[in-house]
Amino acid sequence: MNGFYVGTWERPKGTADRLTYDTRWIQSDTGRPLSLSLPFGHAHRGDGAQTLRGDKVAAYFENLIPDNERILQRLRDRYGARSTTPFDLLAAIGRDCVGAIQLLPAGTEPGDIRHIEATSLNEAGVANVLRNTTLSRHPGEAPDDDAFRLSIAGAQEKTALLRHRGRWCIPHGATPSTHIFKLPLGLVGNVQADMRMSVELEWLCMELVREYGLPVAHVEIGRFEDQKALILERFDRVRARDGHYWLRIPQEDFCQVTGLPPNRKYESDGGPGIRRIMDILRGSENADADRENFFRTQLLFWIMGATDGHAKNFSLTLLPGGRYRRTPLYDILSTLPIHSRGANRMDPHKARLAMAVESGNRHYLIHDIHRWHWVGMAESLGLADRVAAVIEDLIERTPRALDALAKRLPEDFPTELFDTVANGMTAAVKRLAREPDRRSVASVRKR
């Protein structure tokens, strides 16, 4: 981690994954566990080190790789990994992961992070990197021996580059990437929903969230020859104090926090929901702000029709001494532009939030969630004195946020995309404004 030896990850044949923390790391001023689910205190002491074993160790590392089998197979072929298992893949591509760790074969030196090693790219070079992102190695070709081997979790096609001295670069050795490039999604899911404009849509959603005053990653739309990408500035990277090199910032997503594999990222599949995450955020350095903003984000996702707010799309920054706080938001996509019936569309009555709103029963369907559900859940989470202000603030901010963003859309931004999202959000807040805080007896009988 930033040149410091943390420990070893092993997968002995026939036994559980094993993580051994080095004592020097544990005792260091900068030392911290890799995850809240893998604390120092729960490790078994022995031979000057501490060891953890089991499913939580395996889950932590599995969450560092993409959770898309097609992407995993392509990475295996491209880099000559033995298999698509997390251990074999990360042995090949674990030099630049989400967060701060670098995974290297035993005995390999990590390199000097204080010295930037990179190959500068022109526009054609960046375009070529983006084109090659989705390509596998052809039969008979040698594995890609580029020294920069990165692993970015998630289900979307993406790559990463370094921004150095005003130019895009391929980093090498210990030098980290600073920006993630996300390619258009295309047709996605079982219904093959048309998300070919996902780059513009995600930019729109991220900038809308910024207009509401919530912490969110900086994004821009990049075009390089015939290639287009959403460029996200990494908040797990920061310049060193002297400004001459980059440091990696430890972080983990909420699947890692809770020790769960990525196939349980949705609450309906056994992942953490709003209540579990709100409980964890009680231990944050910024507990009050982090908890209120997390609840506010869930309500805003309902307004936006953003259905992918699962456990991997919320993260913590890990600080020395076991301290932590929430990271900025990222990976926000509204489904409003595809709400209709027909080919490549999503039935709006089937649109579900990733985390249930609990108020008596558990509610996932967006159309079935009402103001009184949000109020009831907020009260059960200890936000009774804040929920009315949060709801009214979102109602009042929505027209201002939409107007402000409309004035700074890029020149070639598709106006119909903005209008669809704006109309859907406006309808949602009007409904929120007219509904009561308490469900009436008449509505109970009606249902």
What is the predicted function of each stretch?
Residues M1-R447:
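Phosphate/dinucleotide-binding and metal-coordinating scaffold of catalytic cores
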